[in-house]
UniProtKB/Swiss-Prot annotation:
Catalytic activity: (2R,3R,5S)-2-(S-pantetheinyl)-carbapenam-3-carboxylate + AH2 + 2 S-adenosyl-L-methionine = (2R,3R,5S,6R)-6-(methyl)-2-(S-pantetheinyl)-carbapenam-3-carboxylate + 5'-deoxyadenosine + L-methionine + A + S-adenosyl-L-homocysteine + 2 H(+); (2R,3R,5S,6R)-6-(methyl)-2-(S-pantetheinyl)-carbapenam-3-carboxylate + AH2 + 2 S-adenosyl-L-methionine = (2R,3R,5S,6R)-6-(ethyl)-2-(S-pantetheinyl)-carbapenam-3-carboxylate + 5'-deoxyadenosine + L-methionine + A + S-adenosyl-L-homocysteine + 2 H(+)
Necessary cofactors: [4Fe-4S] cluster; cob(II)alamin
Species annotation: Streptantibioticus cattleyicolor (strain ATCC 35852 / DSM 46488 / JCM 4925 / NBRC 14057 / NRRL 8057) (Streptomyces cattleya)
Induction annotation: Part of the thienamycin (thn) gene cluster. Expression is regulated by the ThnI transcriptional activator.
Keywords (A to Z) from UniProt: 4Fe-4S, Antibiotic biosynthesis, Cobalamin, Cobalt, Iron, Iron-sulfur, Metal-binding, Methyltransferase, Plasmid, S-adenosyl-L-methionine, Transferase
Descriptive protein name: 2-(S-pantetheinyl)-carbapenam-3-carboxylate methyltransferase
Residues the entry annotates as binding cob(II)alamin: N18, S72, Y74, V75, H103, G126, E127, D214, C249
Chain positions recorded as [4Fe-4S] cluster binding sites: C206, C210, C213
Gene Ontology terms, MF aspect: 4 iron, 4 sulfur cluster binding; cobalamin binding; metal ion binding; methyltransferase activity
Entry keyword annotation includes Cytoplasm: no
GO cellular component: cytosol
Length: 681
């Protein structure tokens, strides 16, 4: 099936901007659903969607003779799209401007007074409302209040339309992929040599109503399904068109029994054609056997970006405040062990600044996740207040003392006006956490992310926990205190620079949420040798700073551990643990062709794999050839750009799979008396 040839008719334009190239699925779904009606198909000429970010003036100039301009609004694109709409409306005052998406407020309030160039707001699901708007526009005297699920501008006031209509439980909309509607966007990305992501829905809806999220309310909660035959044909389309990166947009993939069959079909396509290569997905909130089987299927097929074991917080009072039910720490521990047994990468997401979360509960929560076995990937996000999130009411904001700061999302070019700079209201203070405590908590987070998740102190801290009963929270709190008082040390200078940056981040509106490091000349200079990228994160910066002062850092860490009461006199194994910790780190001079060999008086590779220490001499041969998900990155001795790609990976998507260190669990471990084999792993 192919998209109909271009024809004369009223021009319809879509805008849905993303900093990362996502194929414009929303535009495709709205178009294919609307064109089922012969009046729409005959009366309108749909233009290629605008989905790649460009200058506002340039985007506006590219919209010629529009009759309808549709905006898919998110927190990351709202202001730019509004300005494009305003500029185009000034040239074409008779066109219809329709705004939909999660950033369109359910309660319009003074929206039309602030944005008088917008004519109609679509609330929630858009297919039915958009089709009916297009049909109504063909009338001699259109009355958009006849359309379901909209608010219509009347002067500066909002007049509601009819009650919203949603698609049925079995969603039978045409596929924009199978009809060829997405072909133009794919061609554009490939012509510009852009790594792009195909967005894909298998179901729609979310049965949860977490207070910080607008997904459940936006999708009206009930789960509705796309046809299984259509999904199989779309999988075949992705494979035939060599779509490497797939983003499954479901809110809870794995919640339905059929999701395992969908996962297997994707794995089969990967095995048969090589595509897709990587899948990003929002797994079901309460992980279950099905999510495990899906994860194992994709792990075995080399498709998995990691499995989420959801938390947001480990504190029960916090979870109650945000209407969130979690799996519990004991179940979390069992799941973590189950995934680890199969070598499946998991990650856990927390949010800093949630209602009732104190500095102590937050730090102890991270420590409890480490105690449960999540040593590879703990991700912490700031708490942004979304327009339609259940918590966004005056009563709840005041009741929890949520004090926000409007933050820019991106590093903007000098002179970028405020009405083009995307912002989000970030919670920087609550009744339970002051601003200084918020800063200290983020410093603690970064220490865990680039030292523990990033492996520099992971095995050292595991050893101290197991042999000396120094808990993870205590280890990283004391590390933060020790080096924070020693600015001349490597870690001290890193920590204090991070602390200053977070204070500046609160106080300076222009400092952005994303690409924060790129806004700091001194940090950018530190990273220049590793290649140019806007997406360096703070933990990337910290990790590479240590890579540049590797030996000195470990000398200073030995002094810190001695301050904890553990030294070579009290623990004869400590020196070898330090050496093992250093040996497993990926270094700029590593040569995959040669590998590395090291010897120990005890089986430390086995100890950090099984927890059991065997007192026997061993030789460990490290022969890793490639790093990262799919083994995409090969280090080259002395090539710092190749080193950074192998050690850290790309800026997007964030993945800690296969980075930072050698896979000693798969290394060749023998007795020093045995000959060394040469096979590479």
């Amino acid at each position: 099936m192919t998209v109909p040839a271009a024809r004369s008719g009223r021009k319809v334009y879509f805008i849905g901007l993303n900093a990362v190239p996502f194929l414009p699925l929303v535009a495709g779904l709205l178009r294919t659903y609307a064109e089922q009606d012969p009046r729409v198909a005959a009366g309108y000429d749909f233009q290629e969607p605008v989905f790649l970010v460009d200058g506002v003036q340039e985007m506006a100039a590219g919209i010629t003779d529009p009759d309808v301009l549709a905006l898919s609004c998110y927190v990351w694109n709202f202001r730019r799209q509004m300005k494009v709409a305003r500029l185009v409306k000034e040239r074409h005052p008779g066109m219809l401007v329709v705004a939909g998406g999660p950033h369109v407020p359910d309660r319009p309030g003074d929206f039309f007074a602030r944005h008088p160039y917008v004519d109609v707001l679509v609330h929630g699901e858009g297919e039915t409302a958009f089709r009916e708007l297009l049909i109504e526009r063909l009338a001699d005297h259109p009355d958009y209040t006849r359309v379901p699920g909209v608010s219509v501008r009347h002067g500066t006031e909002a007049v509601p339309g009819r009650p919203a209509e949603r698609l049925p439980r079995r969603i039978e909309t045409p596929s924009p992929y199978l009809l060829g509607v997405m072909d133009g966007a794919v061609a554009t990305c490939r012509q510009r040599d852009l790594r792009f992501y195909a967005l894909w829905e298998t179901n729609r809806g979310c049965p949860y109503s977490c207070a910080f999220c607008d997904w459940g309310s936006a999708t009206m909660s009930a789960l509705r399904l796309f046809d299984a035959e259509r999904l199989q044909e779309e999988i075949e389309w992705f494979a035939e068109h060599d779509v490497e990166d797939l983003f499954v947009c479901d809110a809870n993939f794995g919640i339905l029994p059929r999701d395992l069959e969908i996962a297997r079909a994707l794995a089969d396509a990967r095995a048969a054609t090589g595509a897709p290569k990587l899948i990003r997905v929002n797994f079901a909130k309460n992980s279950n056997d099905r999510v495990f089987e899906i994860s194992k299927t994709w792990h075995d097929a080399d498709l998995l970006m990691g499995t989420t074991l959801s938390m947001q917080s480990t504190d029960l009072d916090v979870l109650e405040a945000i209407d969130r039910k979690n799996i519990g720490l004991e179940n979390y521990r069992k799941l973590q062990q189950r995934y680890a047994t199969e070598n499946i990468h998991t990650y856990t997401e927390l949010i800093l600044g949630l209602p009732l979360e104190s500095p102590r509960s937050f730090r102890d929560g991270i420590g409890s996740l480490l105690e449960a076995g999540n040593h590879e990937d703990i991700r912490v996000y700031e708490f942004g207040i979304l327009p339609n999130a259940p918590i966004n009411t005056p009563e709840k904001i005041a009741g929890y003392g949520l004090r926000t700061v409007p933050k820019r999302l991106y590093v903007e070019e000098p002179g970028t006006p405020d009405d083009e700079a995307e912002t989000v209201d970030m919670v920087m203070e609550t009744n339970a956490m002051s601003r200084d405590e918020w800063v200290d908590c983020f410093g603690f987070v970064q220490a865990v992310q680039f030292l523990h998740n990033g492996c520099y102190t992971r095995y050292l801290s595991m050893y101290l926990r197991q042999r000396h009963d120094i808990g993870y929270t205590a280890f990283y709190e004391r590390l933060q205190q020790y080096f924070g008082a020693r600015p001349d040390t490597v870690l001290g200078s890193i920590y204090l620079r991070m602390r200053k940056l977070y204070h500046d981040y609160i106080d300076i509106p222009e400092l952005p949420l994303a690409n924060l490091v790129a806004s700091q000349p001194d940090m950018a200079a530190d990273l220049a040798r590793y290649g140019k990228r806007r997406g360096w994160t703070i933990d990337n910066w910290g990790w590479l700073r240590i890579a540049n002062d590797f030996e000195r850092t470990y000398t200073e860490l030995r002094d810190f551990v001695a301050a904890l009461g553990v030294d070579d006199t009290s623990d004869p194994d400590l020196a070898e643990v330090f050496r093992f910790q250093q040996d497993v780190m990926l270094r700029p001079d590593y040569d995959p062709a040669a590998g590395r060999t090291t010897e120990y008086t005890a089986d430390w590779p086995g100890y950090f794999t099984t927890g059991e220490l065997r007192r026997r001499p061993v030789r460990m041969r490290l022969a890793d050839q490639r790093f990262g998900a799919n083994g995409r990155y090969t280090p080259v001795p002395g090539d710092l750009k190749a080193f950074a790609r192998a050690a850290i990976g790309p800026s997007y998507p964030v993945s800690r799979i296969g980075h930072y260190r050698h896979r000693f669990e798969a290394a060749e471990v023998t007795s020093p008396a045995e000959p060394v084999l040469t096979e590479q792993r």
